[in-house]
From Swiss-Prot:
Blocks ryanodine receptors, and potassium channels. Keywords: Calcium channel impairing toxin, Disulfide bond, Ion channel impairing toxin, Neurotoxin, Potassium channel impairing toxin, Secreted, Signal, Toxin. Belongs to the CRISP family. Residues 1-19 form the signal peptide. Expressed by the venom gland. It comes from Varanus varius. Residues 41-169 form the SCP domain. One of its GO terms (molecular function) is potassium channel regulator activity. Gene3D superfamilies: CAP, Crisp domain. Disulfide bonds join C77-C156, C95-C170, C151-C167, C189-C196, C214-C231. The keyword Signal applies. This is Cysteine-rich venom protein VAR10. Pfam families: CAP (PF00188), Crisp (PF08562). It is found in: Secreted.
């Protein structure tokens, strides 16, 4: 059965935090390879710590094309104007998106950690433990098959929350039908123990979850078999 995919564009709105005022916008530009490494390392470090553990969590890597897409989203300066699915479709793959806004610049590690900390109100397989609380940033950060990421920041001086950080993830997570199961529970790398880097799988397959059976089909016949053409 084909499921309608629900790719959530998510925004975290946080006010000024202490200890962040020494940063400058230039310190956070994602054209800097050091910043790219910080973003990737932070995501991968957090993905290794999910509880319950994940047997199929992919290792993330940086993608400049996705970063350019995230930059276009950041230039809008308005989290209410969500990036359309068409604009977030890169190479035929629909990507997910997380937003973060703040009154003062924050390190990328801090912003990503804030998304991840939504897990404090999340129960695997159930969803939010408090009605209405946001958990979609967390589930996107730890979505098992989102293995490419690109991020950007923009200064929006007309707004009180003027620092606008955007990350896009490909393939996107938060898929309808399993958005509260962002990965499969099991021993780290148990899905592909020969393709493993410290608990993260290194055998990505860029397919969309158009069918509930896509993960099993892809495992059996690979990414390029006609059976998985619509995965």
């Amino acid at each position: 059965m084909i499921l309608l995919k629900l790719y959530l564009t998510l925004a975290a709105i946080l006010c000024q935090s202490r200890g962040m005022t020494s940063l400058d916008l230039d310190d956070l530009m994602t054209t800097n390879p050091e910043i790219q490494n910080e973003i990737i390392n932070k995501h991968n470090d957090l993905r290794r710590t999910v509880d319950p553990p994940a047997k199929n969590m992919l290792k993330m890597s940086w993608d400049n094309i996705i970063a350019e897409s995230a930059k276009r989203a950041a230039l809008r300066c308005n989290y209410k104007e969500h990036t359309s699915i068409a604009e977030r479709t890169i190479g035929g793959v629909v990507c997910g998106e997380n937003y973060f806004m703040s009154s003062n610049p924050r390190t990328w590690s801090s912003s990503i950690q804030s998304w991840f900390d939504e897990r404090n109100n999340f129960m695997f397989g159930f969803g939010p433990t408090i009605p209405g609380v946001m958990v979609g940033h967390y589930t996107q950060v730890v979505w098992y098959k989102s293995y490419k990421v690109g991020c950007a920041i923009n200064l929006c001086p007309a707004q009180s929350l003027k620092y606008f950080q955007v990350c896009q993830y490909c393939p996107g997570g938060n898929v309808a039908g399993r958005k509260y199961e962002p990965y499969t529970i099991g021993e780290p790398c148990a899905a592909r123990p020969k393709d493993c880097d410290n608990g993260l799988c290194t055998n990505p397959c860029a397919y969309n979850d158009d069918y509930t059976s896509c993960p099993d089909l892809t495992k059996q016949v690979g990414c390029h078999h006609p059976v998985t053409a619509n995965c």
